[in-house]
Amino acid sequence: MPHFIIHCSDDILQSMPQSEFNQHVYSVAAHSGLFVSGDIKVRVQAFSTYLVGEQQQSFIHVFASIMQGRTVEQRAALSRAVVTKLTSLFPDTPNIAMNVDEFEKATYCNKAMLG
């Protein structure tokens, strides 16, 4: 963790390769100073059928899932930094947003913790 799961309209990946898109979000997260670089996970899921309001408009939405312990200000700065970067890369995309959700350390488990 943390996980950055990006949902976007499929036209986004027609203008930039997925690997490059992932790298941009990864770089912003790594430079935030909030995470160990090797722990950051980024992935994209593109959609061909969707509605934004009542129409099919291009969109990018980043869902960040991070372990508890960061301040509201840190989480807000992370969102702002990612949205700022994506806005610079996709200036014609009308809908770009991000939210940050926290999960409890006490309930988190991964394979390495089992043994």
Predicted feature residues:
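A domain-level signal for the structural core that forms small-molecule/cofactor-binding pockets
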Residues: 2-115
